[in-house]
């Protein structure tokens, strides 16, 4: 099994939000992502529902992982709105497209997108990226 390392040491921001259909597939289950106490994983298939929940709980989120292609709001629009509401929330965009797009590069430079995952996503790749983002949060919180 894959576990997030050291997540229980976070004093705040204890929620990981996963938005999209394919990211929420059973292959990448919550127990592989987060069985360390102190963290929870919330999954949303609809980006509008995810955004509404985030607006009400913006200080609880450590990380949002979003698919690029979704109905109503695409992943880049969602992550930009997330960053506008809480710039300290880490963000990861997933896509099955080549991410050499100028807009994706621009969003990455501006720290709107903090990480990228190319589909198909293997469970260990997701866990590694989540660990990386959590480590950044922990090092930022120490400052």
Where are the language model's segments positioned?
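Two-component/phosphorelay signaling modules centered on CheY-like receiver
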Residues: 23-43, 110
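Acidic, metal-coordinating helix/loop segments flanking the phosphotransfer/catalytic sites
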Residues: 43-63
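Active-site residues of response regulator receiver
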Residues: 67
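Receiver (REC) domain active-site loop signature in two-component systems and cognate sites
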Residues: 70
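Hydrophobic/aromatic residues positioned on beta-strands within the core alpha/beta folds
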Residues: 94-96
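C-terminal output helix
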Residues: 118-130, 134
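The C-terminal output helix
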Residues: 131-143
């Amino acid at each position: 099994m894959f576990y997030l390392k050291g997540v229980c040491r976070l004093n705040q921001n204890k929620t990981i939000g996963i938005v999209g259909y394919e990211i929420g597939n059973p292959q990448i289950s919550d127990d592989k992502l987060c069985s360390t106490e102190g963290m929870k994983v919330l999954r949303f298939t609809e980006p509008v529902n995810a955004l509404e929940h985030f607006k009400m709980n913006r200080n609880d989120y450590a990380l949002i992982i979003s698919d690029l292609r979704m109905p109503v709001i695409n992943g880049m629009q969602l992550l930009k709105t997330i960053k506008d509401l809480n710039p300290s929330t880490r963000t990861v965009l997933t896509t099955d497209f080549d991410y050499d797009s100028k807009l994706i590069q621009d969003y990455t430079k501006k720290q709107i997108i903090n990480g990228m995952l190319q589909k198909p996503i293997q469970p260990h790749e997701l866990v590694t990226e989540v660990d990386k983002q959590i480590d950044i949060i922990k090092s930022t919180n120490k400052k």
